[in-house]
């Protein structure tokens, strides 16, 4: 008897996090859908100079090329290290895939959006990836990404989770990202801040979204 198929989802952490810390932060959410999905975690390419003795603070790119720092509120003309991160994620997918979807938090969510846009423009390949999940997502404010952030994302189901009390990525910023997807997104608001919240209140919604994506996977196979 063959085992029940599951989704494989690649997860991208936020700024000043790492793969292992993000694994811990998503534990409760992953547990809710463990019968439907398996999750893998990729580490950011760039170290953040917070503490010279700590290697667990990572970034996907920097918005300030002097301080080598990042702010989601900072309009900038640079995206230092972005292309290296794109190449690293694409390589990770090639070597560890196939994956069915991407999941990101904060800067990781923005990175997921940019990867999808690059794939839709034909600049990179994301084989097998058909959906995305965003926690505290936002559109990059770097002018380097204008061609990507202005692109309508077509035929790509997505789920967007945002906090009404998020003071780092305000809800309207996450809603603006969701608006860029032509397929009507699933939007879930919580009353917390800049976190991956407990999703137990929304178990039926997230499980329903996952089941839809799993059904699509089975149909396409």
From Swiss-Prot:
GO terms for molecular function: hydrolase activity. Belongs to the LovG family. It comes from the Eukaryota. Keywords: Hydrolase. It is an enzyme of class 3 (hydrolase). Disulfide bonds: none annotated. The lineage of its organism: Eukaryota, Metazoa, Ecdysozoa, Nematoda, Chromadorea. Coiled coil: none annotated. Pfam families: FSH1 (PF03959). InterPro entries: AB_hydrolase_fold, FSH-like_dom, LovG. It comes from Caenorhabditis elegans. This is Esterase C25G4.2. The active site is at 106 (charge relay system), 166 (charge relay system), 194 (charge relay system). GO terms for cellular component: cytoplasm; nucleus. Its EC number is 3.1.2.-.
């Amino acid at each position: 008897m063959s085992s029940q198929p599951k989704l494989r989802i690649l997860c991208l952490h936020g700024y000043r996090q790492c793969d292992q810390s993000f694994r811990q932060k998503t534990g409760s959410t992953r547990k809710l859908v463990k019968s439907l999905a398996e999750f893998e975690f990729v580490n950011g390419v760039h170290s953040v100079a917070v503490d010279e003795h700590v290697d667990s603070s990572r970034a996907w790119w920097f918005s300030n090329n002097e301080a080598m720092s990042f702010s989601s509120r900072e309009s900038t003309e640079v995206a230092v290290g972005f292309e290296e991160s794109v190449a690293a994620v694409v390589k990770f997918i090639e070597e560890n895939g196939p994956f069915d979807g991407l999941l990101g938090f904060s800067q990781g969510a923005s990175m997921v959006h940019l990867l999808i846009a690059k794939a839709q423009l034909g600049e990179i390949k994301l084989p097998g990836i058909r959906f995305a999940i965003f926690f505290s997502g936002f559109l990059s404010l770097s002018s380097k990404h204008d061609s990507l952030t202005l692109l309508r994302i077509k035929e790509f189901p997505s789920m967007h989770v945002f906090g009404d009390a998020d003071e780092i990525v305000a809800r309207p910023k996450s809603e603006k990202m969701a608006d860029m997807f032509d397929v009507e997104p699933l939007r879930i608001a919580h009353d917390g801040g800049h976190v991956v919240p407990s999703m137990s209140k929304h178990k039926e919604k997230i499980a329903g979204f996952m089941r839809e994506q799993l059904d699509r996977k089975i149909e396409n196979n």
